[in-house]
């Protein structure tokens, strides 16, 4: 993986959930270095809304995907707000 790659979180873990990030959310790698297996990933929302989080995600907890749809992140957020 490298900076600017689009990724999807493939696990549900408490440490990510505390940041508001859940399985299925999509983000992009926003730092060019991997530190001890972790990449800094930004999870945004659609349009001009504030980002959900920018947090370190272990490379085994995500997969690279061809394109991002931030609206997907908003749908997942709503499921956890209920």
Residues covered by each model-derived region:
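Long, low-complexity intrinsically disordered regions
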Residues: 66-82
